[in-house]
């Protein structure tokens, strides 16, 4: 009997330890209002100067594509994912901007395109602050705004659409990251999780030699500090804690890669994407134009020239969605 009490006592103490350390450091964020620029080009030049000072790799810096010096009927803001860059979405998004003659801006998230240590040390608050400021600045580019985000960028776009429903006129979510596919990743929600992960798996997740030879390596972090995943986990925990899906009213288009149980997105949970989309559709304010598109030929990254995917399907669905949202009837040709 004493042994049983002793065992139960240990189990109880361990359970209490898990509960306390799980909630010990709940991520917090509040947008710090900053003076906005009088024109977008001034903001853009300042961001490029910052990128130059940080020695951002070529092709990873911010990019502005203008079809008018004035506001276009709508503009597009693209937000890339964790460890990625604008190359993640350029092939499809550039074509969309060209087809609709829409001003387009690709943000460079803090800690990206620079070096592994900068990526590791950039907090989720910095990433969200920069994204929110870019979003507010982009109102100068178009009369209305289309927000496109891939993976972590989809998570951030979800947050912005929930916080600013009147400012997001169309939301395109590409493999949005709402949860990890590896159940071990829950470890990052504990205060000791990052240190434990470093002990078990080492400090850096190394890429293969084949991955390093791939031209895409110039635009993604192939090697990554596991500590950087803590920032992604914190971002996810904070955003999902705001209950964003109950607040989204913008027309929403979701793309996800799924062919079967064996062939599906291995970086972000497909079931979490579909569950989130279901919550949006059931929140009482959802747009009738909402649509989820299953892409059977693809992978986690769907909009990039460096990754194979059904671009014809993706372009057709996105263009139709935009035409429906803005009541357009354009005959589009991809020349």
Locate predicted features.
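N-terminal membrane-anchoring alpha-helices
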Residues: 2-42
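The alpha/beta-hydrolase serine catalytic core
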Residues: 32-61, 176-244, 295, 302-311
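Short, surface-exposed "cap/lid" segments of acyl-processing enzymes
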Residues: 56-100, 104-108
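Serine-hydrolase catalytic core
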Residues: 65-70, 216-298, 310-319, 323
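Short beta-to-alpha linker loops that shape the active-site pocket of alpha/beta-hydrolase fold enzymes
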Residues: 108-113, 177, 298
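Catalytic nucleophile-loop/oxyanion-hole region of alpha/beta-hydrolase
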Residues: 115-141
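Gly/Ala-rich beta-loop-alpha elbow adjacent to hydrolase catalytic centers
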Residues: 149-157
């Amino acid at each position: 009997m004493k042994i049983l009490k002793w065992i139960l006592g240990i189990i109880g103490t361990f359970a209490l330890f898990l509960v306390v350390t799980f909630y010990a450091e709940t991520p917090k964020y509040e947008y710090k209002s900053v003076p906005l620029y009088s024109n977008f080009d001034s903001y853009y030049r300042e961001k490029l100067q910052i990128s130059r000072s940080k020695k951002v790799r070529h092709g990873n810096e911010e990019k502005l594509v203008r079809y008018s010096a004035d506001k276009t009927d709508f503009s597009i803001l693209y937000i890339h994912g964790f460890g990625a860059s604008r190359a993640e979405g350029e092939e499809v998004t550039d074509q969309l901007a060209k087809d609709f003659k829409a001003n387009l801006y690709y943000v460079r998230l803090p800690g990206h395109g620079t070096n592994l240590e900068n990526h590791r040390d950039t907090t989720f608050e910095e990433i969200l602050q920069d994204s929110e400021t870019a979003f507010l600045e982009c109102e100068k580019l178009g009369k209305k705004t289309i927000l496109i985000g891939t993976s972590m960028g989809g998570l951030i776009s979800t947050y912005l659409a929930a916080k600013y429903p009147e400012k997001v006129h169309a939301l395109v979510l590409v493999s949005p990251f709402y949860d990890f596919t590896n159940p071990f990743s829950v470890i990052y929600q504990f205060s000791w999780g990052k240190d434990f992960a470093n002990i078990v798996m080492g400090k850096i997740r190394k890429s293969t030699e084949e991955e390093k030879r791939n031209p895409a390596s110039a635009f993604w972090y192939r090697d990554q500090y596991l500590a950087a995943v803590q920032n992604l986990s914190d971002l996810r925990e904070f955003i999902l804690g705001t209950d964003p899906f109950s607040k989204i009213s913008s027309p929403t288009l979701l793309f996800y890669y799924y062919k079967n149980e064996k062939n599906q997105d291995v970086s972000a949970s497909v079931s979490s994407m579909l569950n989130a989309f279901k919550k949006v559709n059931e929140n009482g304010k959802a747009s009738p134009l909402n649509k989820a598109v299953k892409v059977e030929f693809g992978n986690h990254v769907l909009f990039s020239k460096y990754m194979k995917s059904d671009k014809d399907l993706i372009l057709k669905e996105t263009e139709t969605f935009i035409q429906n949202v803005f009541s357009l009837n354009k005959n589009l040709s991809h020349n």
